[in-house]
Amino acid sequence: MRFMVLMYPSEKAEQGVMPDPKAVEQMMKFNEELAKAGALVALDGLHPSAKGARITWDRAGKPVVTDGPFTETHEVVGGYWIIQVKTKEEAVAWCTRIPSTDARKVELRQIFEMTDYPAEVQKAADSPEVRATIERIEKSARS
């Protein structure tokens, strides 16, 4: 099972304040433990929302672009992990070990696997080009 762990940072981080080196060391130790256990698939930190944009769609289906920063900082994702584990309980156990250096909360979401969808959805989603791209990305991530 794959899970995405979304990290919601403190207001300081959203304002662009960098963490102190000790906090980074603690987070890297956690990341190394994830990697050694074979659970780490991917991770990244994100720039503050001031460098981003939000795209929503109006009732007519027209995209509306709003440049950051976003005032609702509790809704801003500051980073993520993708982990692969056997159960949700194992994923929760990993999340409880995340150093609280900058994270004010994390959200754990299971990632859909193609086999989670009904056969007709799998067939509709089958695209040789997309499948080849995903396989190439997964192969490069393993090397």
Task: Specify the residue positions occupied by each region the protein language model found.
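Conserved, structured core segments of small domains
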Residues: 1-143
